[in-house]
Amino acid sequence: MTVCAKKHVHLTRDAAEQLLADIDRRLDQLLPVEGERDVVGAAMREGALAPGKRIRPMLLLLTARDLGCAVSHDGLLDLACAVEMVHAASLILDDMPCMDDAKLRRGRPTIHSHYGEHVAILAAVALLSKAFGVIADADGLTPLAKNRAVSELSNAIGMQGLVQGQFKDLSEGDKPRSAEAILMTNHFKTSTLFCASMQMASIVANASSEARDCLHRFSLDLGQAFQLLDDLTDGMTDTGKDSNQDAGKSTLVNLLGPRAVEERLRQHLQLASEHLSAACQHGHATQHFIQAWFDKKLAAVS
């Protein structure tokens, strides 16, 4: 059931911290209770609960509110947690030796480094499975809303989403590529899960087709901005993950240079802001959150 929510014009720091705490609390409740011999469960919890930005679930919650949605809190929160589980699973797999071969993630050893490759793979599969189960069991959502949410998330994971993006990155990333080819890889790797998050928010809010279209465009530009920021910070040592992972890869930073990439990033953010404003008529909390986050990150790059 959806009802009209009060207008959330801005997002205070306390409100953002409370939302983040709510996400972590619900994730903790939804994930398996850690047992002494349940190594896969422990790896699932480590992958999903390690301190992180929780950008995707935060955006889902904030966008739903800015669309005028007030739902059963746990129901909307469960959708947000499902998205975070998918994101965590993708990071576990991306970090594997056969892929990016990363040793550090969120300031901690990667899951395969800590638990072994076999446990890491199983934990990622279990997180993906759990995500869909969480949507199916979410309170306060109609069966149709759940079905549509499952469809959005499954599309974001598969060959039109994360899988395709990772494959393109692995198979083409070390070869010369055009800017257009790099942008397409970035779209699959990053934009698609943002798009699923936004569309899930619009489903719960029963948003208009026009608003959904604006949110789709917002997601495309936001995903590109995030990936460009990731490329710009690749050489930094305080990101919580391995530095110089893009050495020898065809990225826009290597192709165009940092200054041109930062300008492109700001252009994507401006377009994203315009699309978001057109979609959300009940508040600007999402806008405030995105702007504050990127301002902080770009200040460290400049």
From Swiss-Prot:
Per the record, the pathway is:
Isoprenoid biosynthesis; geranylgeranyl diphosphate biosynthesis; geranylgeranyl diphosphate from farnesyl diphosphate and isopentenyl diphosphate: step 1/1
What top-level branch of life does the organism fall under? Bacteria
Question: Transferase as a keyword?
Answer: yes
Q: Provide this UniProt record's keywords sorted from A to Z.
A: Carotenoid biosynthesis, Isoprene biosynthesis, Magnesium, Metal-binding, Transferase
For the protein in the UniProt heading, the enzyme class is transferase
For this protein, the record's Gene3D superfamilies field holds: Farnesyl Diphosphate Synthase
**Residues engaged in binding Mg(2+) 1:** D94, D100
The residue stretches assigned to a coiled coil in this entry are none
The entry marks the following residues as binding (2E,6E)-farnesyl diphosphate, namely R105, K189, T190, Q227
Summarize where isopentenyl diphosphate binds, as residue positions.
Answer: K53, R56, H87, R106
Key word GTP-binding present: no
State what this protein does. Catalyzes the condensation of farnesyl diphosphate (FPP) and isopentenyl diphosphate (IPP) to yield geranylgeranyl diphosphate (GGPP) needed for biosynthesis of carotenoids and diterpenes.
- Protein name according to UniProt: Geranylgeranyl diphosphate synthase
Taxonomic source organism: Pantoea ananas
